[in-house]
Amino acid sequence: MAAVMALTVLRSRITRWPQWACAGPAPFCAVRRSVFGFSVRSGMVCRPHRCCSSTAETAAAKAEDDSFLQWFLLFIPATAFGLGTWQVQRRKWKLKLIAELESRVMAEPIPLPADPMELKNLEYRPVKVRGHFDHSKELYIMPRTMVDPVREARDAGRLSSTESGAYVVTPFHCSDLGVTILVNRGFVPRKKVNPETRQQGQVLGEVDLVGIVRLTENRKPFVPENNPERSLWYYRDLDAMAKRTGTDPIFIDADFNSTTPGGPIGGQTRVTLRNEHMQYIITWYGLCAATSYLWFRKFVRRTPGV
């Protein structure tokens, strides 16, 4: 019992006096490793080997962690730079598309080709037709809001009106081609969807029309499916509409000049595209610059506290 107490006092003194715990020998008798965890050599007490190796391992692990963090954080400005450059390319593509679209819409009207396959390369191209309407087979695409061409060009695709209504789509027999097509006559407010409320605007007899060629519209997310049996149309589906009305799958938007008093308001083609890529370019390049500066301060200049 006395021997154990003596060894306990010895260990407390070694812990209290750091100079005794150095790597060199100390003038004490040998102590078993199983009691204190010290290594023994020639009867001398030595500092445990694992203390020195643990310090070196900790320093190496810290250096490895710093290296990983350095390259991981560099990924943020690199990604932001890549996204900014991608938006530059997207903006060039969008400007080219807008210019092409504007040139098509402003072109002189051409006679409507009778072959639907030929129309696939003519979307947004003005065409001219002559014939008469069949108002007994009207279809309604709704809900829709009215497009004001002047405001549409200014607001670049935003809704031009808050009033909800429908587009009136009417079969039109082309007397010169011998085919029947679908014509979007234009917008009517919800209270005027019923044709009985707008008899004055139901055009009779042969007329000349200028319209914009349109193709089938892809259904957007959250837009319901069309229901031809119940005559519910939410987006433009040429094949389904043609089958329902017995017409050819050819569709044009009548221009604003086709508008008659009391009838649908023509010119309901959205010919502008929203171009917000410059905002994205500024955002991504700004994020790249900010994160690059912070990374430089942290890992290159080694600013304290950063």
UniProtKB/Swiss-Prot annotation:
GO cellular component: mitochondrial inner membrane
Protein's cellular compartments: Mitochondrion inner membrane
Membrane topology: Multi-pass membrane protein
A GO MF term: cytochrome-c oxidase activity
Top-level taxon of the source organism: Eukaryota
Keyword annotations: Membrane, Mitochondrion, Mitochondrion inner membrane, Transmembrane, Transmembrane helix
BP GO terms, sorted: mitochondrial cytochrome c oxidase assembly
Main location: mitochondrion
TM annotation in the entry: 68-86, 280-300
UniProt cross-references to InterPro entries, sorted A to Z: Surf1/Shy1, Surf1/Surf4
UniProt function note: Component of the MITRAC (mitochondrial translation regulation assembly intermediate of cytochrome c oxidase complex) complex, that regulates cytochrome c oxidase assembly.
Protein name: Surfeit locus protein 1
Organism per entry: Rattus norvegicus
